[in-house]
Structures are given as C-alpha cells and as structure tokens.
C-alpha cells in the first residue's frame, strides 16, 4: 500500500487520474473491510486520488464480487488507471489477472517464500515483475532469481526494482505502466473476448454457488448424509456426490 501510495502520486505527475481499489481482509466481527490499506495511503487521499476499500468477504481468491462493478463506475467517472490491490497471493493474483489489463506481481526480499512463489507458477500471469523494498538485504539475489525464472520466455519480461523508503524506481514504474497502457489499448479488441468470457463464467458460478447454498439450507437429506459421514458410515466424497445429483435433477 505504501508503494501504491507513491505510485499514484507519480502517475498524477504524468497527467493521469488514478483510483485505487484496495481489496482488504474482511473483519470477522463486522463483515466489513479492515481499512489498513487506506490508512497507509493517506498521502494519496490528500492529493485527490480516489481510494475505495472493498472487503474480500470470502469470495473466490480474495476478489470481492463488487470489484467488477466498482471498476465500471470508476471508468465512467473518468479514472485512469484504476489500480486493484489484492489481499493475498496465489489464487488471488490469478483472479486479478482475469480482470485487469495489466498485472504487476510484487515480491519482497524478506518474504520467506518468495523464491518458492516464483517456482510455483505465479510468474506466468504478470506483465511486470517487481522487487519492492530493494534497499533491503537479499533484493539483488531475488531480482536475479526473477530474471532466471522469467527471462526464459519468448517475450522479454519487464522486471523492475523499487524502494519506497528511498523513493527509488517509482518514476520508472509509473512510466513503464503508462507505456504498457498505451500498448494494451491497441491490443484491447483481441483481449476483450477472453475478459468478457471470464466475467460471464464468474457470474454463472456465483449464481450456481448461491443456488446450491440455498438448497443445502432447505434440504432434509443434507442432515441425513451429514449424520452418515459423522458416523463413518459414508465418506464425504460419496455423500457430496449423492447430494449433488439430488440438487441438479
């Protein structure tokens, strides 16, 4: 969030109108967003950047269902670019890459699983790979590891380093994003079909999930199968298979 704070300020210098959608963890007490991201971006708020915190609410990955609609509203309001900050790793970033035009995958030197994350395939989804907190020990080694794992593809990967503490690399990141935005606008027609397809699929799966959840709540057979599983008379996979067949008759 500190990085996005500085990045949004730099983008304003490039005559852009940034907005930030921060997908925050959900409070187990209130069900709302825990506004840690927004607190850390107070400097951007002071300079007029629109910042909206959205609770993840246990959605697939960490992307709330409202993100897409929020994007539409912000686009109509003339904000560009719209920065989506995720709350986690792995599946979260994959979900974001289906929504966003440009995906920036960020690594920190002191995150113990950074190299494992690189090996795990997260490097397949990014347009830019960023080593943040590059002033810390281990940043150079992490940067080189990224070059080794990512630089073997057909297209040359964009790998950058930033340091919010020393205010280094932020300007280069903002300029790189602006140039990528221009290129993505040219290529948008070819990518639009896959984005719409992904959105439609997500909506259908959400609808099915809600419908099944309602059926489970009303189902008498669910309690019966639950008891069988608890008493070890049936394994959960067999029970789930039978219940699913009942629900989709």
Question: Would you name each region that the model predicts?
Answer:
Residues 109-137:
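Flexible active-site lid/hinge loop adjacent to a nucleotide/diphosphate
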Residues 161, 172-248:
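Long, well-ordered amphipathic alpha-helical subdomains in the mid-to-C-terminal portions
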Residues 24, 85, 122, 132, ...:
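Residue-level signature of catalytic and energy-coupling elements of molecular machines
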Residues 34, 70, 95, 99, ...:
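Alpha-helical scaffold elements adjacent to nucleotide-binding pockets in ATP/GTP-utilizing enzyme cores
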Residues 128, 133-186:
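Canonical P-loop GTPase G-domain recognition
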Residues 1, 5, 61-68, 140, ...:
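Electropositive phosphate-/nucleotide-binding environments in soluble metabolic enzymes
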Residues 2, 6-92, 99-105, 110-114:
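Nucleotide-state-sensitive switch-loop elements of NTP-binding domains
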């Amino acid at each position: 969030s500190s990085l996005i704070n500085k990045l949004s300020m730099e983008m304003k210098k490039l005559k852009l109108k940034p907005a930030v959608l921060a997908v925050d963890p959900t409070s187990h007490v209130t069900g709302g967003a825990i506004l840690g991201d927004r607190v850390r971006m107070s400097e951007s708020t002071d300079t007029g950047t629109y910042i909206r915190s959205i609770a993840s609410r246990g959605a697939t990955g960490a992307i709330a269902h409202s993100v897409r609609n929020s994007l539409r509203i912000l686009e109509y309001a003339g904000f560009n670019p719209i920065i989506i900050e995720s709350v986690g790793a792995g599946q979260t970033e994959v979900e974001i890459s289906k929504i966003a035009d440009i995906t920036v995958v960020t690594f920190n030197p002191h995150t113990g699983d950074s190299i494992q994350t690189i090996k795990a395939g997260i490097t397949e989804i990014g347009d830019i790979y960023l080593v943040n907190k590059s002033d810390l020990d281990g940043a150079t080694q992490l940067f080189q590891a990224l070059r080794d794992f990512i630089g073997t593809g057909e297209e040359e990967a964009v790998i950058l380093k930033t340091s919010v503490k020393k205010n280094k690399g932020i300007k280069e990141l903002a300029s790189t994003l602006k140039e990528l935005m221009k290129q993505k606008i040219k290529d948008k027609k070819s990518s639009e079909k896959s984005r719409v397809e992904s959105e439609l699929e997500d909506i259908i799966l959400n609808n099915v999930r809600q419908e099944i959840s309602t059926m489970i709540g009303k189902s008498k057979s669910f309690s019966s199968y639950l008891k069988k599983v608890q008493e070890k008379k049936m394994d959960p996979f067999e029970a789930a298979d039978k219940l699913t067949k009942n629900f989709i008759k």
